[in-house]
Design a protein with these regions (language model features):
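Helix-start/capping segments and mature chain N-termini
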Residues: 1-124
Length: 124
């Protein structure tokens, strides 16, 4: 289950594989089976602690313009034209059919499709 979690103001993490302490602290606050979907302070969607996200919408497969880290599967899908970037916000979640979690080990074809998260945005 995805849980909305706000990133700190100015948070930049181009190398989320190098120092995972922030992500570990967030995960420690969640229940078993919950995964944080990070939201920037302006309400724009980012990604999770270990995947990029793709929203399944009526307009096709959309991914946030500014992920924390662009993964190889994310780049491959963009270059192939299978997904497109959009200025996605929390409000867009209510209109999507689901959220795919993708990374190098989970290509879109076999990626889990989760229901959009509901509820308030949590903060550290």
């Amino acid at each position: 289950r995805l849980v909305l979690w706000e990133l700190p103001e100015g948070f930049d993490y181009s190398y989320k594989y190098a120092d995972r302490s922030f992500f570990d602290a967030v995960q420690a606050e969640l229940q078993q089976g919950e995964l944080p979907l990070f939201v920037r302070p302006d309400g724009s969607l980012s990604d999770t602690s270990y995947t990029n996200i793709v929203l399944w919408t009526a307009a096709g497969y959309r991914t946030p313009e500014r992920p924390l880290l662009e993964g190889t599967e994310h780049r491959r899908l963009l270059e192939a034209g299978r997904i497109s970037t959009a200025p996605l916000s929390v409000a867009d979640l209510s209109a999507c059919r689901g959220v795919y979690l993708i990374n190098a080990m989970m290509p879109l074809e076999s990626a889990p499709l989760l229901p959009p998260p509901e509820g308030l945005i949590r903060r550290v």
